[in-house]
Amino acid sequence: MSASEAQVIARALFDSLTGAALQALHTATSINGEVTTERLLAALPADAPREVRNLILALGKEGNLDRLPAVVAAFEQMTRRGGARPLTGEVTSAVELSPQQRERITEQLKARYGPDLEVRFSVDESLIGGLIIRIGDQVLDTSLRTRMAAIQRNMMTG
């Protein structure tokens, strides 16, 4: 399966799950009169996602049911954007990369992480050579500075 096919399937799943959650949340926030955890839960459709029920229970337990409409509005805004935040990659090199190098790196990263990946490039001469690529919480460090530091540690320890 290609990355683009996986993206299409993931988008369909995302739309389905968020659509059901939004519909259930809108139903819950449309009740009139006193807002209680019990009334909100009773207003939900039987097939409402478990996460929606858990959200209402958590807000009720903390006395924050009045904040549910704001949470729904924020969630709706996120789903319109297609998720929480687009994934961003930061590529740091020891020297300025050519447009062709940037394009090749961007293509390779998008093939692995999806077409919506935003890639930024920066220069840090202290790397001496190589690259450091950060995407989300993942870091790939092929810099000469890191390799030399590892050699130095190995020499010091034995």
Swiss-Prot record:
GO (cellular component) term, any one: proton-transporting ATP synthase complex
MF-aspect GO terms: proton-transporting ATP synthase activity, rotational mechanism
The UniProt record lists the keyword Membrane: yes
Localization annotation: Cell membrane
Chief location of this protein within or outside the cell: membrane
Topological type in the membrane: Peripheral membrane protein
Assembly with partners or alone: F-type ATPases have 2 components, F(1) - the catalytic core - and F(0) - the membrane proton channel. F(1) has five subunits: alpha(3), beta(3), gamma(1), delta(1), epsilon(1). F(0) has three main subunits: a(1), b(2) and c(10-14). The alpha and beta chains form an alternating ring which encloses part of the gamma chain. F(1) is attached to F(0) by a central stalk formed by the gamma and epsilon chains, while a peripheral stalk is formed by the delta and b chains.
Entry's family note: Belongs to the ATPase delta chain family.
Function: F(1)F(0) ATP synthase produces ATP from ADP in the presence of a proton or sodium gradient. F-type ATPases consist of two structural domains, F(1) containing the extramembraneous catalytic core and F(0) containing the membrane proton channel, linked together by a central stalk and a peripheral stalk. During catalysis, ATP synthesis in the catalytic domain of F(1) is coupled via a rotary mechanism of the central stalk subunits to proton translocation. This protein is part of the stalk that links CF(0) to CF(1). It either transmits conformational changes from CF(0) to CF(1) or is implicated in proton conduction.
PANTHER family per the UniProt record, alphabetical: ATP SYNTHASE DELTA CHAIN
Name of the featured protein: ATP synthase subunit delta
Underlying gene: atpH
